[in-house]
Amino acid sequence: MAIDPYRHLLRPLLFSGLQADPELLHQQFLSLCGWLNQDRSLCTWLRQQLQQWYALSDPRLERQVWGLRFPNPIGLAAGFDKNGVARSVWSAFGFGFAELGTVTWHPQPGNPRPRLFRLGSDRAVINRMGFNNAGAEAMAASLERSPPASIPIGINLGKSKITPLAAAKEDYLASFRRLHPLGDYFVINVSSPNTPGLRDLQAKEQLAPILETLQSANHPRKPLLLKIAPDLSWEQIAAILDLVQAYELAGIVATNTTVAREGLKSQTIPQTGRSPAEEAGGLSGAPLRQRATAVIRFIHEQTQGTLPIIGVGGIFTPEDVIEKLAAGATLVQLYTGWIYQGPSLLRELLKGLLAAADQETPEK
């Protein structure tokens, strides 16, 4: 059996001790990916080598959604490449699509550090990043000089912290107009727990003007989705679905991180010495899996399977992917699982999907 250099050699070093800063490690990895994103012969060759190592291509994995071709149904979730510095690299790791951002109209530093915490025994992460990003103009500049992507690229839009809730629609609109030519689909993020008041925008009276404003400016028409929180009640989700259908949105991303902390094994966060319950922020990873899947199933049932769903939350194994697809997800996304398992996870998941497809295909 071949040794995975990330999982068996690099990851134990990165995750060892209490000195490792998860955010610094993320920045270093993203800087490397940004360098690989250059339109230079060496970088192109290295991307090709990564693709041979990590990617898996098979016609049975392909999906057609919103008129876009997805080489496979597994994408990179928003939050990893906030500024769009590595657009052409994500396909080399095997992703079938990538969602950039969250990006805001105004550049902003995010919340004070520390703001990213690993809960190893739970295979989870708590983050309170606060939409730290260089702004929509900087993302546009990065994408305009980047080599083209071979997979669909989504862009996740958030509200700037300095923008009052009453002016949220104008803030989203400014980013949407600037980035519209550069994304294949767009996601309205009103569900992060780390921007004060943002989740209030999920209420009907707050959300409707945002959806109306963005759809009115959506020319030529591109898929516009909404990302929702897992902590909503079924009644709240049903009300959101009414708006999604009324304003003809293309789909739902389910779900964002949770503010719940029930059932965690981790007692203390090493960086702060406090318990997970005492740390503000959104929880992602394995503890979110069941709730995210339940939300996907509810949306699928409420819409009779007519609304495409991107399922995200707690994917670590092929069975996790299959569970979300069976619940009604059209596509799925990774974030925390990829951090813990490393780049080889994509290939494992895709092999698992193919194995499941083989089992479903009757012998001739």
Curated annotation (Swiss-Prot):
Q: Where in the cell is it found?
A: Cell membrane
| Membrane topology field | Peripheral membrane protein
Q: Which cysteines are joined by disulfide bonds?
A: none
Task: Give the molecular function GO annotations.
Answer: dihydroorotate dehydrogenase (quinone) activity
Tell me the keywords, alphabetical order: Cell membrane, Flavoprotein, FMN, Membrane, Oxidoreductase, Pyrimidine biosynthesis
Q: Which GO terms describe its biological process?
A: 'de novo' pyrimidine nucleobase biosynthetic process; 'de novo' UMP biosynthetic process
The cofactor(s) it depends on are: FMN
Write down how the cofactor binds this protein: Binds 1 FMN per subunit.
Q: Where does FMN bind?
A: 78-82, 102, 156, 189, 227, 255, 285, 314, 335-336
Keyword Flavoprotein (UniProt): yes
Locate the residues binding substrate.
Answer: 82, 127-131, 189, 194, 256-257
Q: Describe which pathway this protein belongs to, using the record's wording.
A: Pyrimidine metabolism; UMP biosynthesis via de novo pathway; orotate from (S)-dihydroorotate (quinone route): step 1/1
Q: Which EC class does it fall in?
A: oxidoreductase
Q: In the Enzyme Commission scheme, what number(s) does this protein have? A: 1.3.5.2
Active site, UniProt feature: 192 (nucleophile)
Q: Which GO terms describe its cellular component?
A: cytoplasm; plasma membrane
Gene3D superfamilies associated with the record: Aldolase class I (3.20.20.70)
Q: Which reaction does it catalyse?
A: (S)-dihydroorotate + a quinone = orotate + a quinol
Please explain the role this protein plays, according to its UniProt record: Catalyzes the conversion of dihydroorotate to orotate with quinone as electron acceptor.
Quaternary organization: Monomer.
Which family is this sequence assigned to?
Belongs to the dihydroorotate dehydrogenase family. Type 2 subfamily.
Task: From the Swiss-Prot or TrEMBL record, give the protein name.
Answer: Dihydroorotate dehydrogenase (quinone)
Taxonomic source organism:
Thermosynechococcus vestitus (strain NIES-2133 / IAM M-273 / BP-1)
